[in-house]
Amino acid sequence: MADIYEHQVPEKLRGKYQAMIVYCILGFGSLISWNSMLTTADYYYKVFPDYHPSRVLTLVYQPFAFGAIVILAYHESKTSTRKRNLIGYILYTISTFLLIVLDLATKGRGGFGPYTGLCAVVAAFGLADATVQGGMFGDLSLMCPELVQSYMGGMAVAGALTSALRLITKAAFEKSNNGLRKGAMMFLAISTCIELLSVMLYAYVLPKLPIVMYYRRKAASQGSKTVSADLAAAGIQNQSDLSDDDSKNQRLSKKELLFQNIDHAVNLFLIYVCTLSIFPGFLYENTGQHGLGAWYALVLVAMYNCWDLVGRYTPLVKWLNIENRKLITIAVLSRYLLIPAFYFTAKYGDQGWMIMLVSVLGLTNGHLTVCIMTIAPKGYKGPEQNALGNLLVIFLLGGIFAGVALDWLWLIGKKNAF
């Protein structure tokens, strides 16, 4: 039955650009809340000066994200993608709104109690991240590379746009009373609205787009059970005729999929170990004082986010897209030369060199991530693609977790670090 979907090119292409826009917004929604917190870290450093906010909050976030994605990936074949993603986006919406409530309730004052509450909300962000990222990448692995790239591009847009808005709000509120707090609250209010929009788009718009229906019906014909609820939301109730041939629905186990893609998984892990060992903690606490003053860390974060966005779109240029697995591995390992480069630049270099290094870090992070996530699912059946997408997200979040932990090593030998 799967063969009937191979020749429906007109239907397959209908709604493609609308789907790309929707997936871009969903990618934006999957990171806007967390990026808003990272980008407004200067506010949290003012409120909680003794608690290393950018490092501690990231370290709180990651164990919950990593633990949740491991559990969800193990049960991915029995979990409704629709319920999973909706729960994730709703959790993002509630958690972001709670940050505003927490700040208003404490009147922007610091202390151990408010910081504990902040950490609890950040832990909820971690759970939402694992729920959404694994679910979305598993679902997108069923589809064409352009939709995967659009979602990942949206994730980078979240970083670039929040950085741009942070620079604008800092300039606008810098001389006003409680300017940092006003800017941070504005960010969180915007993030809450975007998360709510993401819930609406995923629930009511995405399931009815023809190209999305095409790929989900194709996955169902190959034995995927995770798409049933999404197809039902599109008005396709009876799936018995789409998966009636069990001989065609046999799939590789998770162990076999991981063995065949171990280089992709390890490369994703290494990409994010390198990136998160530098960004954002090192940029906020280890780059010293320069002519840009309080703007310096914000400019560095903005440059990283902007070039990460550029890097996620460069694979669209055919001769820049890396599909050779050995070349990807070489490129990933080469990024580790950036670590000593950052160390010596922070110690001896000026701000121009640091901005250049941050740009390279962002560009390579975005480019290599998209290359891996778009080529890995090729050649597999729907259920296998969904499982592989979840497995890759485990290694991606594992790399982030390890990178965040290693980021603390930059504090060794620093006066008054703890």
Curated annotation (Swiss-Prot):
<feature type="transmembrane region" description="Helical">
    <location>
        <begin position="112"/>
        <end position="132"/>
    </location>
</feature>
<feature type="transmembrane region" description="Helical">
    <location>
        <begin position="264"/>
        <end position="284"/>
    </location>
</feature>
<dbReference type="GO" id="GO:0005337">
    <property type="term" value="F:nucleoside transmembrane transporter activity"/>
</dbReference>
<feature type="transmembrane region" description="Helical">
    <location>
        <begin position="353"/>
        <end position="373"/>
    </location>
</feature>
<feature type="transmembrane region" description="Helical">
    <location>
        <begin position="326"/>
        <end position="346"/>
    </location>
</feature>
<protein>
    <recommendedName>
        <fullName>Equilibrative nucleotide transporter 6</fullName>
    </recommendedName>
</protein>
<dbReference type="GO" id="GO:0005886">
    <property type="term" value="C:plasma membrane"/>
</dbReference>
<feature type="transmembrane region" description="Helical">
    <location>
        <begin position="142"/>
        <end position="162"/>
    </location>
</feature>
<keyword id="KW-1003">Cell membrane</keyword>
<feature type="transmembrane region" description="Helical">
    <location>
        <begin position="86"/>
        <end position="106"/>
    </location>
</feature>
<feature type="transmembrane region" description="Helical">
    <location>
        <begin position="19"/>
        <end position="39"/>
    </location>
</feature>
<feature type="transmembrane region" description="Helical">
    <location>
        <begin position="392"/>
        <end position="412"/>
    </location>
</feature>
<dbReference type="GO" id="GO:0015858">
    <property type="term" value="P:nucleoside transport"/>
</dbReference>
<keyword id="KW-0812">Transmembrane</keyword>
<dbReference type="InterPro" id="IPR002259">
    <property type="entry name" value="Eqnu_transpt"/>
</dbReference>
<keyword id="KW-0472">Membrane</keyword>
<keyword id="KW-1133">Transmembrane helix</keyword>
<feature type="transmembrane region" description="Helical">
    <location>
        <begin position="56"/>
        <end position="76"/>
    </location>
</feature>
<comment type="similarity">
    <text>Belongs to the SLC29A/ENT transporter (TC 2.A.57) family.</text>
</comment>
<keyword id="KW-0813">Transport</keyword>
<dbReference type="Pfam" id="PF01733">
    <property type="entry name" value="Nucleoside_tran"/>
</dbReference>
<comment type="function">
    <text>Nucleoside transporter that can mediate uptake of adenosine, uridine, guanosine or cytidine when expressed in a heterologous system (yeast).</text>
</comment>
<dbReference type="InterPro" id="IPR036259">
    <property type="entry name" value="MFS_trans_sf"/>
</dbReference>
<feature type="transmembrane region" description="Helical">
    <location>
        <begin position="291"/>
        <end position="311"/>
    </location>
</feature>
<feature type="transmembrane region" description="Helical">
    <location>
        <begin position="186"/>
        <end position="206"/>
    </location>
</feature>
